[in-house]
Amino acid sequence: MKKNLLAIAAFALLLTSCETKLVEKVDLIPLAENVEIHKGAFPLSNLQSIQVPDEWKLTADNFVKDLQKTASLTVSLTDSEGSLVIVKDESLSAEAYRLNIEKNRIKIEAGDIQGVNHGLASLLQLIMTAKDAQLPVLTIQDKPAFGYRGLMLDCARHFWTVDELKETLDHMAFFKLNTLHMHLTDNQAWRLSMDKYPDLVKEGTYYYDFPELSGKYYSKEDLKEIVTYAGTRGIEIIPEVDLPGHSIALLAALPELSCRGGKFEATPEERDWNKRKRGNENMICIGNPQSFAFAEDVIDALIEIFPSQYIHFGGDEVPTDIWEECPKCMALYKREGMKSPGEIQDYFTRKMSDLIRSKGKIMIGWGEINDRHAAGPNDVLTIWRDNGVEKQKIALEHGISV
């Protein structure tokens, strides 16, 4: 009997000693901060159930769909201990996670929904590249190297449907991006529906020569649905309304906010440049108090939909020639003691910054809003031009976030 027991023990020891690492390295995008690969493997056939805190069940549902779509694996949620266990650990820093793959169980620990998404994204990437339908036994400890990891979508020049936006959010989560910047308005279209101004999306998305492209915009319900879905993916959406320039589509609906009045037409990107009308008059009248009342209505509409602490208010590429010929703008210029026409935009920038801050939000603007140092320490700049490095340095020296 003793001999048999010794033989069994020796055989078990032999099996253990022969066990090797399934792989020597794993490929993740982005690279994880720390990866330790151990001997042994977890068979994917054992991944059958997920135990997750109630607050993260929608995120786990997303992962279940991702598994079915990318790896043809069918997994369900369970209230008992699953083969994948997701645990909340508030000691972990923002967006950090730990992923432990053992021979008989997988465990993800995170302190917030972003960390959960990142842990699941790493697991999904490992599953998609699995060797012989097995995952290596390993430990990953990871957190982002950069706080802002974003993607901008120009929804004004090219309309993205709700389903297309959700698919984009899926891809963003896969690569652990955390911010979607939605450019909602421009000369080409005004995509933001506002109850107080029903003609905005009617006239601001109408193209006489491209009827098939007309009438595409986002209702409040559409945007709230996108925001909610983004939240389950751990992604923040920052809305942008581009003012005081880039406003042809706005002026098509509200020409009274222009300096000269008259008829304006939204200009689809597909329209030939030679057929675009009044393109040089794409700014609102800063000397008209109605422009500021409208801007506040826009801010209120964005706050109702988007929980982000940020509102991007544009501010790029604003010529001053029309303002210089506008009696209302020049009256403002003289009344405020301005010394250059560019200060007309600076006046608008400061007013918007104060207004947005008074509503508990932070204004973001394109780099041009700080050409004459109009941005304040509470504002954030988005640098986009080729000379942005120098502008960035100057802004940072003045205590402005970039």
Where do the language-model regions lie?
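Bacterial Sec-dependent N-terminal signal peptides
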Residues: M1-K25
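Acidic, contiguous N-terminal accessory segments
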Residues: C18-R149, R357, I362-N370, P377
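Active-site-proximal beta-strand/loop segments in catalytic clefts of secreted hydrolases
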Residues: P53, A110, T185, E240-D242, ...
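Flexible loop/turn segments at secondary-structure boundaries
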Residues: L58-T59, F159-T161, N187-R191, P244-L250, ...
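Feature activates predominantly on carbohydrate-active enzymes
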Residues: L92-Y310, K351
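Active-site neighborhood of glycoside hydrolase catalytic domains
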Residues: R260, D272-D379, R385-N387, Q392-G399
